[in-house]
Every structure is written in structure tokens, then in C-alpha cells.
């Protein structure tokens, strides 16, 4: 179908861009050729490990030879997705999974490098690394549709950070609301993307109310 074809073309383009930036990364021609142009089936084992990690269960990732530091994940201040490639998750990942990890890692690199986003909000947004990675693995429309619920939530969070209030009480309210939404996603998200849509609706309503009260 046209939509699936567009998504495959997007992934191929992203792959080429990443290969240009990272010459050592092998070409993964299987993307366009897999299953006659279809995406490979979801790697259930990888998803299970990510869900456990999202919920704070890092035991399966702390093994000999793994450089993954689970303590960094709860802090949200470091891009742990780069380390994830060297963990059991990365070793179990197929080519599509590995590329998805790289692309989502690049997305969070932009967030962490944005000097306009306060560190306290970066730390909260950073805790969404694993849920967002799961979304990207579950639904490739995450990359091709700006209206995707998870992308809209990230965009709204970034815009809220740009409008970070001068007054401490307004900062505290936004911080508390974002933390509430992040914790809810961490606790409840498995495969139902509606949790991101609900969080987006609630955040927009909160921001409109804050604007009304300003």
C-alpha cells in the first residue's frame, strides 16, 4: 500500500543519512527487501525486555560484558539508548530494531543538546526514552507522521519548555504536571498508544488553563 511504501522509503532515507554520518555502520539492505518490502515482524523478546526496563526491572540487562548502566535510566539526564545497543537488548535486536534504536537515540540527542529546555524538564522527558523507543518499534508511522500521538506529546513538551515561566510557582506546576504524565506512561504503557494521546490531551488542557490564568 502507498502508506507502507512511504514508510519504507523514509526508513531507507534515514538509513542512508545515518550511514553517511556513521561510515562504520553497515548498509542494511534488508529494510527495503524484507518480506517483499514489508516490515519484519515485531521482535517480541526485545519488546519484553524494554517493557521490563521501562518498569524499572533492569536485572536482565546487568550481565557480564554489558556496558549498560541502569542507574542512568531513572535519572533521565543521559541518553541511555546509545548504551542500550551494547546490552542484551541490542544483541537481541534485528537490523530494523538496531536502526530504530539509533534513530530514536538521535532524537533524544537533539532534546538533551537543546539549551532552551531546562535541565529539570530534560530529565523528565529523558525518562520517556524507553517508551518512545517501544512506540517506534511498534508503529513505524512514528517517523512518518507528525500527527502521531507520541510525536505530538514530545513536541508539546518541547514547546512548553520553551515557554518556561519566570515565576517559580508556574515552573513548579508545569514540572509537577509533566512528572505526573511521565510516571503514568512509565507505569501503564505496554502497546496501547492511546496512553500518549491521553497524555497529550491532558498536557494541552493544562497549558491552556495556565495561559488563561496568566
For each feature predicted by the language model, list its residue ranges:
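Extended, low-complexity, amphipathic alpha-helical coiled-coil/linker regions that act as scaffolds
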Residues: 1-214
